[in-house]
Amino acid sequence: MANKAVNDFILAMNYDKKKLLTHQGESIENRFIKEGNQLPDEFVVIERKKRSLSTNTSDISVTATNDSRLYPGALLVVDETLLENNPTLLAVDRAPMTYSIDLPGLASSDSFLQVEDPSNSSVRGAVNDLLAKWHQDYGQVNNVPARMQYEKITAHSMEQLKVKFGSDFEKTGNSLDIDFNSVHSGEKQIQIVNFKQIYYTVSVDAVKNPGDVFQDTVTVEDLKQRGISAERPLVYISSVAYGRQVYLKLETTSKSDEVEAAFEALIKGVKVAPQTEWKQILDNTEVKAVILGGDPSSGARVVTGKVDMVEDLIQEGSRFTADHPGLPISYTTSFLRDNVVATFQNSTDYVETKVTAYRNGDLLLDHSGAYVAQYYITWDELSYDHQGKEVLTPKAWDRNGQDLTAHFTTSIPLKGNVRNLSVKIRECTGLAWEWWRTVYEKTDLPLVRKRTISIWGTTLYPQVEDKVEND
């Protein structure tokens, strides 16, 4: 066995993997109230609630700022820096490691390689040599489509996004310029989507004994001097996925509850019919993207535009070619002591802002009947007190109970906060035993953009129509 002393030192470590790999983000109290704002064309209700998000993942994203330390076989220290995806690399003399790559067509003898002293440069050089051989000998007959993965979330806070996409997402988030103030005020809805297009994965053979990864020159004292202990054990990067990833910000000022469904249709490439609510939402959506990998440049690329560029962005990196070599986009780690895959557990509280808009409407009355008519129209107007509780204020039309003759027409504007709308219309029959006859009576009418109630006919045969236009 290579380096028995170091092997025994690592095997003797006793630690709680879950505790080491758990990160708790923000903790907040649920002290939020509803509020309502009457705008010129609509009544907007803003409701904020405490939400919690937890994730368990072994797949860690790679960013442009940390990829030089993240190569297959790298030894990383399990501490706060690893939880923040800004890991500490253990640089010591290393024993050879065997690597494999999952590109199609490779003969068994060509699908793996050995690196004598694994480091970022030596591993990258060996992988690049193998890729060059694949392109030359196999690439012409093996067309490799990217393996597509995506995940999405409606944005409410940076802590929430860091739990969802990785603890170092803030770097990418800053490039996306996420306007959380507008989200919290209810002015915008924002969704973040992460597309991963994986071209190939490089893996290392599982470590049989912890000491096998070190040269004999490495001592237990060397590890202790670098802070390695049961409180700060080691993991090794067991695989790295190479390809391209795109972070999309979809931002709209629409207050519709169909925004998430419209964005889902966009992401999945569903054809959206014209003159639909989804089309209106997407036409009112701005897109910003941060693109990592997929071209020879190692830098991140930021582009902005409308939703019609989303499909092009995805298709742009859909296949692995020599012109689209890919970069490290994610990695997994295993504990050096026992090869158990390291699973990171992150959680946070955040404030979810839900905005509901109620459009103003009009109630049109049209009376052309050969009789005297009376209207009784009442409603409540909704508001919220300082504790966020609903307050309903009774209102009534100022011409209720008046005798009105044909031809009478009027429009009653109703604000978006109208609730419990009731309309009663009666006509004078002239009959002693039924002087007033009810022509129309409905309660709790929904507020619509335009409702026209028309009455006509004679005293004994009154007619009525209730026409709703809600485009």
Swiss-Prot record:
Membrane topology reported for the UniProt record: Multi-pass membrane protein
- What happens when you mutate D102A? 1% hemolytic activity, forms linear oligomers on liposomes rather than pores
What residues form the membrane-spanning segments? 158-171, 178-187, 256-265, 273-285
Q: What is the effect of changing D168A?
A: 20% hemolytic activity, inhibits membrane insertion, forms prepores on liposomes which detach easily and rarely convert to pores
Keywords, comma-separated and alphabetical: Cytolysis, Hemolysis, Host cell membrane, Host membrane, Lipid-binding, Membrane, Secreted, Toxin, Transmembrane, Transmembrane beta strand, Virulence
Span(s) of short sequence motif Conserved undecapeptide = 427-437
Q: What is the effect of changing E434D?
A: 50% hemolytic activity
GO cellular component terms given for this protein: extracellular region; host cell plasma membrane; membrane
Any one GO biological process: killing of cells of another organism
- Subunit structure, as described in the record: Elongated monomers align along their lengths, indicating intersubunit contacts and suggesting the prepore structure. Modeling based on cryo-EM shows a homooligomeric pore complex containing 38-44 subunits; when inserted in the host membrane. The size of isolated pores is detergent-dependent; in amphipol A8-35 homogenous rings form with 42 subunits.
Q: What does this protein do?
A: A cholesterol-dependent toxin that causes cytolysis by forming pores in cholesterol-containing host membranes. After binding to target membranes, the protein undergoes a major conformation change, leading to its insertion in the host membrane and formation of an oligomeric pore complex. Cholesterol is required for binding to host membranes, membrane insertion and pore formation; cholesterol binding is mediated by a Thr-Leu pair in the C-terminus. Can be reversibly inactivated by oxidation.
Q: By what name is this protein known?
A: Pneumolysin
Q: Which organism is it from?
A: Streptococcus pneumoniae serotype 2 (strain D39 / NCTC 7466)
